[in-house]
Amino acid sequence: MENFAWFNGQKVAFTDGQTILQVAKQADIFIPTLCAFMPLNHTPGTCRMCLVEVFDEGDEVGRVVTACTTPIKQGQRIFTRNERVRKMQQLQMQLLFADHDQDCKSCSRHGNCELQDVALFIGMPNTPNHSNYIAKRPYDDSSMGIIRDVNKCIRCGRCVEVCRQVQGIGALT
């Protein structure tokens, strides 16, 4: 028997043991995420942007879960773009922006920024202006190999995993 679930009304097959995010990616269904880094199988759920609403068979009320950490189940109905999901994603994005230096023009990723791309995708074309952002944490350039500007960090954990899995060093925590 083939396993299947429904994404926004579209029937999608899957194999046991996959997460909702993995199945969505295979089916070319975009779910925004900032921490999931598939080449490294890095899906800690830290950014909380991959929120989806899930209805198990027989459910009348859905629950909102992170797609990267939730195993997909037979017959689930999954909504990636409804109003409830968007509002929760926007709230999560506001929380990320509240502790993020938004001087985008000074950032090396300006114009090629996943954070800005996801904000636009979820309906936040103009990021909230947190002009009272003062946190200016020290810029760490004490190492020639690693330069860290924690004011731009969104705590996704990607750099830690690349350092550990790709570089084999594990110098970051």
Question: Where are the regions that the model predicts?
Answer:
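Fe-S ferredoxin-like electron-transfer domains
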Residues: 48-173
